Amino acid sequence: MNKILVIILFSLVSLTWGTTWIAMKIATETIPPFFATGMRFLVASPILIILAYFTKTPLLFPYGQRWFQLIISIFYFSIPFALMLYGGMYVSSSVASIIFSSMPVAVLTVSFLYLKKKLFLTQKIGMFISLITLLTILLIELESQCFFQWKGILALLFALFSHAFIYSECQKKCLNVSVITFNALPSLLSGILLSTTSWFIESPHINTFSNRSILAIFYLGDFSGIFGILSYFYLQQKVSAFYASTVFLIFPVIAGFLENYIYKNAILLCEIWFIFPLIIGILLTLIPVNYLKKIRNKITRLSCLLF
């Protein structure tokens, strides 16, 4: 029964994250990105607050860390998610999903450079392979479109590393709060901030919003924003971080298939070939530290016996 539940959760998370990128593109067809992101959070936050009420989960972070809750609202929710929708206007969903499939690599890179975390040789090799391969894929994509999407790619990369930085900060502070606490108030604050800002910089006209863009907002807010995140965190409780993180290798395939089906945009053949080393690099960074320590200890003991 537990294995069936894990398979269901893994499939749901992969499907949810894979369809998210198409939903973002559909949402921004008629709705400006900042306003779309703000409405997405305003749709999600009431449900999260209700869940917090019925599960008796606190809305505020522990005393002494509440200032960090505001930082999360801005640099994990407001700016990165707005940049995701903005970047999705210029970049194909398949390429955008490939960028975000590198999240484990981005987190490891930030941990290495910012937190001075010691990495195993395997992790360093995986990080190097992944970053070089991702850069190559993005350069191929830029050249194929005459550098039209450079703004979108920069926006997505900034969003990626902003998420990675906040995640690393959470590790540094040993932040241990409920997933509902982490999302509820920051979503509400981000929704208010982005919606208000949008009225001044984007001047959205509600009468021009299409029905499918509005439906995409509700999908992003309720299904993807709540159901997808809760499913992923529940999956992490059922399996190791390594197996849970392999979802980052699956959802770009779903995003690419859906984009080809809906928009008839196929990923370039040369980019497909570079995806394989990218997957290898990401897998190398995901190998559990305990497993690497066991291998290192075995090698150390073997070398002592030989010499």
UniProtKB/Swiss-Prot annotation:
Chain segments annotated as transmembrane: 4-24, 41-61, 71-91, 95-115, 120-140, 146-166, 174-194, 214-234, 239-259, 267-287
Lipid metabolism keyword on record: no
Cysteines engaged in disulfide bonds, as pairs: none
Gene Ontology CC: plasma membrane
Organism domain of life: Bacteria
Membrane topology of this protein: Multi-pass membrane protein
Domain EamA residues, every copy: 15-139, 161-287
A Pfam family recorded for this sequence: EamA
UniProt keyword terms in alphabetical order: Cell membrane, Membrane, Repeat, Transmembrane, Transmembrane helix, Transport
Record localization: Cell membrane
Family per similarity comment: Belongs to the EamA transporter family.
Protein name: Uncharacterized transporter BU281
Source organism of this protein record: Buchnera aphidicola subsp. Acyrthosiphon pisum (strain APS)
